[in-house]
Amino acid sequence: MFKQILVPIDGSATASLAVSKAIGLAQAFGSTVTAIYVIDPYPFTGVGTEFAYGQDQYLAVAKAEAATSLEAARATLQAAGVNAGALVVDGHSVHRSILETAQSIGADLIVMGSHGRRGIEKLV
């Protein structure tokens, strides 16, 4: 029924629950699961010049967090015997990036949490 499942993650507990749900579905249907982490490359538009974090620092932290989160998700999926992939996607519109990735990989299903962290909230 579901050959390719997409799981957007953000390092939150809610995203971890989505990975767990995707594992159950993947085991039931023999699916491959791809975890993605969307990084907004321009989160500071309209914030002002006195923001304590610079663009380069933000991107370095965001990429490191993406790598850590994706590796944890991939390890969890593989430990459960699920074929797993992982992608970092740059996109100013997270929901659009998720949908575009789902289309590009041929995802049959998107499993995601609804109350994770996002944007500047991660840095606070």
What are these regions (language model features)?
Residues 54-68:
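A short acidic, glycine-rich active-site loop
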Residues 18, 66-69, 94:
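Hydrophobic alpha-helical membrane-association signature
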Residues 14, 94, 118-120:
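Short glycine-rich, flexible loops that bind phosphorylated cofactors or substrates
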Residues 50-54, 102-105:
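Short, hinge-like loop/turn segments at secondary-structure boundaries
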Residues 3-53, 76-85:
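Small/aliphatic-rich secondary-structure junction motif
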Residues 75-110:
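Structural beta-alpha unit
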Residues 109-124:
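Glycine-rich, Arg-bearing micro-motifs that act as flexible, cationic patches
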Residues 18, 45-48, 96-99, 122-123:
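Short, well-ordered secondary-structure micro-motifs
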